């Protein structure tokens, strides 16, 4: 099932990208004094 494998890799890569992007955007060292916007 090549289609299933491609789908799984796409979803995993997407969630990893969201996790890394969210971690960097919420890093206090990169945004001092801002805190969480939630």
From Swiss-Prot:
It is a single-pass membrane protein. Keywords: Chloroplast, Membrane, Photosynthesis, Photosystem II, Plastid, Reaction center, Thylakoid, Transmembrane, Transmembrane helix. This is Photosystem II reaction center protein I. Coiled coil: none annotated. GO terms for cellular component: chloroplast thylakoid membrane; photosystem II reaction center. The keyword tRNA-binding does not apply. Belongs to the PsbI family. It holds the Pfam family PsbI. One of the components of the core complex of photosystem II (PSII), required for its stability and/or assembly. PSII is a light-driven water:plastoquinone oxidoreductase that uses light energy to abstract electrons from H(2)O, generating O(2) and a proton gradient subsequently used for ATP formation. It consists of a core antenna complex that captures photons, and an electron transfer chain that converts photonic excitation into a charge separation. InterPro entries: PSII_PsbI (IPR003686), PSII_PsbI_sf (IPR037271). PSII is composed of 1 copy each of membrane proteins PsbA, PsbB, PsbC, PsbD, PsbE, PsbF, PsbH, PsbI, PsbJ, PsbK, PsbL, PsbM, PsbT, PsbX, PsbY, PsbZ, Psb30/Ycf12, at least 3 peripheral proteins of the oxygen-evolving complex and a large number of cofactors. It forms dimeric complexes.
